[in-house]
Amino acid sequence: RARPRF
């Protein structure tokens, strides 16, 4: 979603 992957 924001920083990681989602």
UniProtKB/Swiss-Prot annotation:
Phenylalanine amide sites (modified residues): 6
Function recorded in the entry: May act as a neurotransmitter, neuromodulator or neurohormone.
Family according to the record: Belongs to the NPY family.
Taxonomic superkingdom: Eukaryota
UniProt keyword terms in alphabetical order: Amidation, Neuropeptide, Secreted
Annotated protein name in UniProt: Peptide tyrosine phenylalanine 1
Tissue spec: Limited to neuronal cell bodies, neuronal processes and sinus gland.
Predominant localisation class: secreted
Subcellular location per the Swiss-Prot or TrEMBL entry: Secreted
GO cellular component, one term: extracellular region
Keyword presence, Secreted: yes
Biological-process GO terms, alphabetical: neuropeptide signaling pathway
Native source organism of the sequence: Penaeus monodon (Giant tiger prawn)
